[in-house]
């Protein structure tokens, strides 16, 4: 694909049929000029692309003419390599820090409404604002010439979005002093508008957009529980990354992606010291980056991550992992999140009673797997028996509730010797074992459970289990959307995995690297801690 072309490319068929409507809301369109996103009230009007802000100046046009050949050659060369694989640098927010239960719970509170609004009632508390960096963040390049952006990698989000030039509230520096950058479409030679008349926008809204005018943008509005909101519009541009060229070797590549351009934010959405440039969504929806790349025939619709719970970082790969071997369980159909059925839970050698009259047949429990959540959240009917069984072998322990939410006790010995492991058994005989050193956290002078009771809210009736990084760390987790399965195996995430190149059939080693925590003027070869590698479908491009 010639990314230097300014003509509109083909629309992606059936592109966003599964996108949750709570995330993207398309207001009535008008033919007014570009909306001032700093004005009030916060009702978004259409964006008109013949507005001065989207019209290059004569100087810009001349400059673009002078660099066209150089950029065209660069993009064309890297486009061929993009069929080998994609590499994004990702790091852990909590790497190098003592595990803090309060820090983890605060992070999960900010995810509450994001999951709640998608049809899952998990009373984690908090406002639901995504104004804090997630567990793992990546560095990517966007535009031509590319600029660098730090984005949260999140399997619970369905779109990629970046703060844009119209956002006056957005911070210039974020987590650990990272230098943040506002995306400006006019600075990119390869950006394209996504209009309200596009198939993309129609599928977001479940049909044609009411009041859509020629050249008006496809808009979105995202609102949170405390009244904060984010307003923006969709664009298409080139996302640049490193591609796998051999064992532990990479080189530049790129691909075109539709993403949200955040133009206005209220409340603390744009002012948090832990903010990032945006979010890189790897959710199940057709709008996620994995679905976009797969719909264009560039990648297999499967990815894997191995999160190093001890050192931070790890591996994040798009493609067919051939080593280690991973067993799998079916994903629950028609679910907005990565969900599977837990059939049994074993604490030590004792099985818990999972029976429920409100959720599905038999004893199985719907369970969400979410790498963006830190802890694990259990229904009250599971939480209390689990905690009681864990401490049953230590009758002298005195349990205390701290800050009205943490179940804690004092203990100075080896937790792995004194307390049992907890094992979740899924369909297809897939098990997931969680050790005491995984589910117990230091908090003040106590040890506290990382298991959280999602039934503390008296209004909650959920029977859903939510498993976050607490159970996923130090495991290779494979998401296979082609076969609608998810699986995992215990693994050393500081080692390597093997990924198949679907073009040549060869197998390449992929391993973790390190990212410095601050600054932006850094070589891309030192910015990789997670590798997002795309292995491409040979029959789709041959």
Each predicted region: which residue ranges?
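Short, glycine/acidic-enriched loop or turn micro-motifs at the edges of active sites
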Residues: 157, 284, 373-375
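Aspartic protease catalytic domain
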Residues: 2-15, 59-95, 132, 143-145, ...
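Conserved catalytic motifs of the protein kinase core domain
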Residues: 148, 275, 364
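Charged, amphipathic alpha-helical segments
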Residues: 216-223, 286-291, 401-412
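Disordered propeptide/prodomain
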Residues: 2-26, 34-37, 43, 47-151, ...
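Short beta-strand-centered segments at strand-helix junctions
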Residues: 161-163, 278-289, 378-380, 466-468
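Eukaryotic endomembrane system proteins
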Residues: 233-246, 250-328, 332-347, 367-370
């Amino acid at each position: 694909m010639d990314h230097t072309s300014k003509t509109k490319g083909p629309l992606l068929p059936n592109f966003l049929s599964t996108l949750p409507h709570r995330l993207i809301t398309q207001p009535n369109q008008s033919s007014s000029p570009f909306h001032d996103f700093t004005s009030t009230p916060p009702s978004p009007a259409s964006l008109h692309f013949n507005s001065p802000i989207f019209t290059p100046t004569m100087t810009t046009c001349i400059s673009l003419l002078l660099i066209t050949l150089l950029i065209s050659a660069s993009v064309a060369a890297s486009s061929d390599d993009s069929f080998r694989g994609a590499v994004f640098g990702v790091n852990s927010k909590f790497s190098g820090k003592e595990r803090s239960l309060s820090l983890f719970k605060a992070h999960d509170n900010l995810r509450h409404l994001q999951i709640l609004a998608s049809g899952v009632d998990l009373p984690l508390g908090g406002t639901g604002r995504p104004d804090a960096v997630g567990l793992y963040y990546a560095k990517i390049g966007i535009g031509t010439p590319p600029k660098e952006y730090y984005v949260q990698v999140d399997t619970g989000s369905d779109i990629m979005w970046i703060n844009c030039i119209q956002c006056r509230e957005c911070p210039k520096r974020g987590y650990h002093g990272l230098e943040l950058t506002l995306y400006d479409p006019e600075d990119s030679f390869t950006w394209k508008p996504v209009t309200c008349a596009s198939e993309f926008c129609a599928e977001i809204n479940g049909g044609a957009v009411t009041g859509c005018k020629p050249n008006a943008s496809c808009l979105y509005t995202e609102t949170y529980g405390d009244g904060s909101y984010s307003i923006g519009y969709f664009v298409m541009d080139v996302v640049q990354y490193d591609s796998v060229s051999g064992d532990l070797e990479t080189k530049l590549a790129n691909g075109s992606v539709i993403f949200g351009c955040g133009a206005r934010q209220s409340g603390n959405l744009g002012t948090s010291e832990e903010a990032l440039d945006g979010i890189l969504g790897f959710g199940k929806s057709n709008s996620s980056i994995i679905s976009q790349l797969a719909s264009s025939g560039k990648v297999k619709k499967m990815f894997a991550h191995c999160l190093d719970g001890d050192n931070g970082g790890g591996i994040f790969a798009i493609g067919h992992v051939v080593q280690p071997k991973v067993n799998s369980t079916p994903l629950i159909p028609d679910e907005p999140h990565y969900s599977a059925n837990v059939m049994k839970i074993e604490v030590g050698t004792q099985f818990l009673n999972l029976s429920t009259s409100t959720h599905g047949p038999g004893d199985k429990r719907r369970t969400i797997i979410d790498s963006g959540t830190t802890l694990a959240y259990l229904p009250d009917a599971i939480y209390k028996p689990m905690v009681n069984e864990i401490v049953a072998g230590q009758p002298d322990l005195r349990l205390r509730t701290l800050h009205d939410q943490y179940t804690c006790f004092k203990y100075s010995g080896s937790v792995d010797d004194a307390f049992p492991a907890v094992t979740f058994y899924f369909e297809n005989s897939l098990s997931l074992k969680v050790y005491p050193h995984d589910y117990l956290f230091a908090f003040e002078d106590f040890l506290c459970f990382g298991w959280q009771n999602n039934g503390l809210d008296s209004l909650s009736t959920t029977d859903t289990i939510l498993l976050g990084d607490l159970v996923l760390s130090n495991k290779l987790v494979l998401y296979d959307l082609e076969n609608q399965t998810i699986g995992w195996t215990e693994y050393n995430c500081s080692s390597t995995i093997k990924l198949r190149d679907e073009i040549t059939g060869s197998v390449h080693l992929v391993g973790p690297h390190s990212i410095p925590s601050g600054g932006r003027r850094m070589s891309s070869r030192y910015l990789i801690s997670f590798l997002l590698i795309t292995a491409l479908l040979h029959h789709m491009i041959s």
